[in-house]
A protein has these predicted regions:
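Hydrophobic H-region at the start of alpha-helical membrane spans
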Residues: 45-49, 77-79
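Transmembrane alpha-helices and immediately adjacent membrane-cytoplasm interface residues
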Residues: 76-96
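Hydrophobic alpha-helical cores of multi-pass transmembrane domains in eukaryotic membrane proteins
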Residues: 49-53, 82-85
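Conserved non-transmembrane functional hotspots
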Residues: 1-46, 72, 90, 94-197
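Juxtamembrane "helix exit" motif at the C-terminal ends of alpha-helical transmembrane segments
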Residues: 50-69
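Hydrophobic alpha-helical transmembrane segments
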Residues: 64-82
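Alpha-helical transmembrane segments of multipass membrane proteins
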Residues: 29, 56-60, 89
Length: 197
């Protein structure tokens, strides 16, 4: 690999890394949104169940002559009203499936970045193996990938990500080396007749 190709290769490595980060951050943000969506759905279900339960208990308490305690008969409707207000608040606060839609946007954007990441990885492999050695061809392919990357960002707004997603992505990319395939994984997954290890 000549010096000119090394410089281009370095630029491609940097773009690969940027796409890997964007891909994983978007995936992590999607996971965060889905967890929040499930949490909110569970809260709304709990609020509805408790509201219904206290309403039923209130009706039973009024009908059963054994309960003479006026304090209990007064407190149960107050609890029911409070739970009903909480349930209503949750319904208005967490609009219908907003977080689920945000998660879908993050996943869709991550998929585009993953595709681009794979293309960069293939180009890097072809250059390193010597399949592509001509600097002009490498520059042309680099520019095509840059155009694809620009188009991804031009087609839609980049979905919002949080610091929490960045931290989670950092641990996945740098801590567990999720973007690397180990020899053990290759031996376990790739059919024997296709392995070169």
């Amino acid at each position: 690999m000549n010096e000119q190709t090394r410089i281009i290769y370095r630029i491609l490595e940097e773009r690969y890394v940027k796409n890997a980060w964007t891909h994983i951050i978007q995936e992590c943000q999607a996971e965060i949104h889905l967890k929040e969506f499930i949490k909110q759905r569970n809260q709304m279900g709990l609020a509805a169940a408790l509201t219904s339960s206290t309403a039923i208990i209130s009706l039973i308490a009024k009908c059963v002559s054994l309960i003479d305690n006026k304090y209990i008969l007064l407190v149960i409707p107050i609890i029911t009203a409070g739970l009903s207000a909480w349930s209503t608040y949750l319904t208005f606060r967490f609009k219908d499936r907003v977080l689920e839609k945000k998660a879908e946007e993050n996943k869709h954007f991550a998929a585009k970045c993953h595709d681009l990441r794979n293309r960069y990885e293939s180009l890097l492999g072809d250059i390193k193996s010597g399949i592509i050695a001509d600097s002009a061809v490498i520059c042309k392919l680099r520019d095509e990938l840059a155009d694809m990357e620009n188009q991804i960002y031009a087609d839609s707004a980049t979905p919002h990500t949080s610091n929490k997603a960045v931290k989670l992505a950092r641990s996945r990319l740098l801590g567990s080396y999720e973007s690397q395939t180990t020899d053990e994984e290759i031996r376990a997954i790739v059919p024997l007749h296709l392995q070169i290890l």
